[in-house]
Regions:
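Helix-biased detector of long, well-ordered alpha-helical tracts
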Residues: 2-399
Length: 399
């Protein structure tokens, strides 16, 4: 559990994650802002006018599963299981669908992109597992009122470019412009409600570690044994830091109350929050000013939402076991941990105080953990974030 102390940490340092070649700040992508267009510049993702439906907007979103396919590959090589490949289907859908949900959009079409090295990866087995995963996940979404159609995709054999495989997807969504969550109205006095990334909801079949798809490079390298880089050199760039952990992929871990194997924890599929969010928006949309999917950037992701907002997260929460284990094994500083990982909070809702109790009750009705994380205050010039934890008080600024 978090507690509070009086230390304030705002020192900039190179994180363990950055040392592995991953930039959570994604420096350089700002050049694309000059050629992109959005009706709502302070929203979580871009929205453009629907040319065929007056009063509606379209959002087109692309994302992938990061380096999670490497874990799926290792799990297959060591155990013969293709479950990790199947889980990637939900990962890719979740990373896209929940992002567009942040503007209130519902998904209508989805395509995937799979690139692999067929000299290393069992092409047919991977595609069969992914097909089954997409089919099950899309059926599940349809049962919850989200009729997103699979519209095909691309499979590329790229042995000279890829060591193992990569997977991503693109979703097309539509939103009624008068009901869009624009982020422009996030204001002082708004409350921040967090939705849990781990555990098991009433609409899920298994326990989830909460890892989602971010921070995986650090997670796998600090947890898994160095032998894997020797046995399967394709799972690690020889010029980068290798694996230095204590565990096999099939090691069952009780430490930090994890209660599953390392492979299960690292391939836990990213939770899809949209079935819950559409109900929240239907009933309490007028109270909601902002929505944030805590993917790249972890608990600092809110910095891209709204303008001149100081997000203060000072509530007591439980950091999921997988993140406590990663921190212990990697020795990543806690300030960076909150940037690298969601830490157990996969989604955030900014809303008016009078709706908080009702929203919490609705969300918890799905068996999804939810709680008040903090509040919004005024900021001058740029967005800011303060996280209070037992490990220090950490301050962050938006770009």
């Amino acid at each position: 559990m978090w507690g509070l102390n009086n230390s304030v940490v705002s020192i900039t340092m190179v994180s363990r994650y950055a040392e592995l070649g991953v930039d959570v700040h994604k420096k350089g992508i700002e050049v694309f802002k000059a050629i992109s267009h959005s009706l709502f510049p302070y929203a979580f993702c871009n929205v453009g006018e629907d040319p065929d439906l007056p009063g509606y907007g379209l959002t087109l979103h692309t994302d992938g599963a990061g380096s999670k396919p490497v874990i799926s590959y290792l799990l297959w090589r060591e155990t013969g299981s293709v479950e990790g490949y199947k889980n990637l289907a939900q990962d890719v859908l979740a990373m896209n669908i929940d992002d567009i949900a942040c503007v209130g959009a519902k998904p209508i079409r989805f395509v995937d992109y799979v690139a692999l090295n067929k000299f290393k990866v069992p092409r047919e087995q991977v595609l069969d597992a992914l097909s089954l995963g997409f089919s099950e996940c899309l059926t599940h979404l349809k049962n919850h009122g989200l009729n997103v159609r699979f519209a095909g995709g691309e499979t590329a054999d790229l042995p000279d470019q890829l060591r193992t495989l990569d997977i991503s997807g693109t979703v097309l969504g539509r939103v009624k412009l008068s009901e869009a969550v624009t982020g422009a109205n996030v204001k002082p006095s708004n409350v921040i409600v967090g939705l849990g990334s781990g555990g098991k909801t009433r609409y899920e079949k298994a326990e989830n570690s909460g890892i989602m798809c971010n921070g995986i490079t650090l997670a796998r390298k600090c947890l898994l044994k160095r032998d894997y880089a020797v046995k399967y050199p394709e799972v690690c760039d020889p010029e980068a830091k290798g694996y230095y952990g204590r565990f096999d992929v099939d090691t069952y871990v009780d430490e930090e109350d994890l209660g599953m194997t390392v492979g299960e924890a690292l391939t836990s599929p990213t939770r899809i929050f949209t079935p819950v969010l559409i109900r929240v928006l239907e009933k309490y949309g007028s109270c909601i000013t902002g929505l944030v999917h805590n993917t790249g950037g972890g608990m600092t992701k809110c910095l891209k939402l709204g303008r001149n907002v100081h997000y203060v997260k000072d509530a007591v929460i439980s950091v999921e076991p997988i993140f406590r284990l990663i921190q212990k094994e990697s020795h990543e500083d806690w300030r960076s941990m909150f940037e690298d990982f969601n830490m157990g909070i996969g989604f955030e809702i900014m809303l008016d105080v009078e709706c908080v109790d009702e929203v919490l009750s609705l969300v918890e009705g799905f068996g999804l953990k939810a709680q008040v994380l903090g509040r919004c205050e005024a900021a001058d010039g740029r967005n800011r974030l303060t996280i209070r934890s037992p490990f220090g008080v950490f301050n962050y600024e938006g770009s």
